[in-house]
Amino acid sequence: MEQAIINIEGTSTIEAAAAAKKLIETFGSSNIRTISVKRVNDKSDEVIVELDFVPGLAPHLHGFTLQVNGLTCGYAGTGPSNLYEVLQAAGVSEAQVAREDITQKSTKTIPLRLERAVTQYGDFQFA
């Protein structure tokens, strides 16, 4: 089954995060089944966030992935703060990932993968 990919890419971490948070709000954080954060490469602070949504949120829309590029981690700054805000909007709690996990260089939080169980009742799916 084909799956759509919505890609957010920008030169401003603030704008990329704002767009991601609005789309998460629109589709509902409770409909996210997988959250993945990975570094672009081993030497970079830049990360890619992938949010995998359940199918059926709109007619003809199978599950889809929201991919956010250009956010960063590993230092105290706007990029890591925006990454933290996107994770919070996606339903990640402070207990799961603390702000310090994102802003400190020495932590091994990234790569990060969180999954939520999905239950289906007839045509309805719940994450």
Describe each PLM feature range.
Residues 1-3:
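Charged, compositionally biased non-catalytic regions
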Residues 5-8, 14-24, 127:
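Extended, alpha-helix-rich binding/interface surfaces that flank or overlap catalytic cores
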Residues 6, 66-68, 110:
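Generic detection of short hydrophobic beta-strand segments and adjacent strand-loop junctions
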Residues 10, 17, 26, 38, ...:
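Amphipathic alpha-helical packing elements
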Residues 95-127:
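Charge-dense polyanion-binding interfaces
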